[in-house]
């Protein structure tokens, strides 16, 4: 009976010792989680291997990852895969759609005020400075002014109704009979009457010379002036009758209707066009800044911004053009990244500080959590090591049994 125990005890004992030795060794990688003290002296192997060297382990892991895995070239490849044109286009399209949806849902005046301030600064501050510089160029607005002159001014002609209305306004407002009467009185001064009378006497000939030297015009013109002064209403009536009898309104209407730059000589038209260009350019150089600023002050930018936002909210073109805009922006970014991706990654690595993130994450993880994480990853492998220890213990015990048998 004792011989039987002698044969079986070594393999069994070796297996048990090997199994539990490996199991204890694996557990001692993490346990105990904290140090233990006896008489103020720390016990050996407390805490476990990994908790005791967690900071150094974190540094080694970070160095390994940054030195072998996340190298600058690998980060560049990762950035290229992440920033493919299709992905960038989809991201930009999503951002634009989100912005448009937010704009549609926006009910406060924040967006309106921002857009109003942008428009006010653009027209009231930036545009005047640019206009002052542009106006110094010789051919500034030449094509636009020529187009306005050729298509609008050159072909402009009043219709018969417009000419009749303008002539009626001239005779009723600008030069009514009373204005003509006052103008005639102001013209018929004693000096002008004397000049007219002397000129008539000197230049008259034939029967007119007899009339001029016998009667003259002095008395007639003086009496006319006196009549205009004393008989105001009657003079206005006579002037109105004279205007009607001479068909002045019809003549002015006909003249205004036929008035057109196309009837002028070509050289005159060219000169007018050049004069218009120079006048506009000179005016913008001298007064363009004040004009734009005054115009900016007179515009209700909040109202215009509100109209623009409302128009954008209801515009179908905005929705249809988002894909095109996102595609163009993605292509621009792609060309930029092809040129400067290496520099961007080199600048991003210190900013991201990935190695420090890894160190902080490992140092901030408790030993218990590390043990759980390792067991989740290599549970079967660790159990195989434990089992291998038991198998090796059995093998060693079996060799001992064989040696004992041979010694007998």
Curated annotation (Swiss-Prot):
GO CC terms: plasma membrane
InterPro entries: DUF445 (IPR007383), UCP032178 (IPR016991)
The UniProt record lists the keyword Cytoplasm: no
Pfam families assigned: DUF445 (PF04286)
Localization per record: Cell inner membrane
Keywords: Cell inner membrane, Cell membrane, Membrane, Transmembrane, Transmembrane helix
Chain segments annotated as transmembrane: 4-24, 385-405
Membrane topology of this protein: Multi-pass membrane protein
Superkingdom: Bacteria
Principal location class: membrane
Family: Belongs to the UPF0754 family.
Name assigned to this protein: UPF0754 membrane protein Tery_3973
């Amino acid at each position: 009976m004792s011989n039987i125990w002698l044969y079986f005890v070594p393999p069994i004992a070796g297996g048990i010792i090997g199994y539990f030795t490996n199991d204890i060794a694996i557990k001692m990688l993490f346990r105990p989680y904290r140090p233990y003290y006896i008489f103020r002296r720390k016990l050996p192997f407390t805490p476990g291997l990994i908790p005791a060297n967690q900071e150094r382990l974190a540094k080694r892991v970070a160095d390994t990852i940054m030195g072998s895995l996340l190298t600058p070239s690998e980060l560049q490849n990762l950035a290229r895969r992440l920033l493919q044109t299709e992905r960038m286009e989809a991201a930009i399209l999503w951002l634009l759609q989100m912005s448009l949806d937010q704009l549609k849902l926006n009910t406060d005046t924040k967006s309106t005020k921002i857009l109003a301030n942008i428009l006010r600064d653009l027209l009231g501050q930036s545009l005047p400075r640019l206009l002052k510089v542009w106006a110094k160029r010789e051919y500034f607005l030449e094509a636009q002014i020529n187009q306005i002159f050729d298509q609008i001014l050159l072909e402009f002609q009043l219709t018969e109704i417009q000419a009749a209305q303008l002539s009626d306004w001239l005779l009723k407002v600008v030069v009514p009979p009373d204005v003509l009467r006052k103008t005639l009185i102001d013209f018929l001064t004693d000096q002008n009457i004397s000049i007219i009378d002397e000129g008539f006497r000197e230049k008259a000939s034939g029967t007119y010379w007899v009339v001029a030297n016998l009667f003259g015009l002095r008395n007639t013109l003086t009496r006319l002036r006196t009549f205009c002064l004393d008989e105001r209403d009657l003079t206005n009536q006579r002037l109105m009758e004279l205007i009607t009898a001479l068909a002045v309104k019809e003549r002015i209407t006909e003249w205004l209707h036929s008035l057109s730059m196309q009837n002028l000589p070509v050289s005159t038209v060219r000169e007018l066009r050049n004069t218009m260009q120079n006048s506009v350019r000179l005016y913008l150089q001298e007064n363009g800044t004040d004009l734009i600023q005054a115009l900016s002050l007179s515009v209700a930018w909040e109202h215009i911004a509100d109209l623009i936002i409302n128009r954008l909210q209801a515009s179908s073109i905005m929705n249809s053009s988002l894909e095109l805009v996102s595609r163009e922006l993605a292509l621009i970014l792609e060309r930029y990244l092809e040129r400067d991706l290496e520099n961007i990654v080199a600048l991003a690595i210190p900013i991201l500080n990935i190695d420090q993130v890894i160190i902080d994450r490992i140092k901030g993880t408790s030993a218990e959590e590390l043990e759980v994480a390792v067991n989740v990853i290599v549970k079967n492998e660790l159990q195989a090591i434990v089992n291998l220890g038991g198998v090796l213990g059995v093998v060693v015990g079996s060799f001992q049994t064989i040696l004992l048998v041979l010694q007998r």
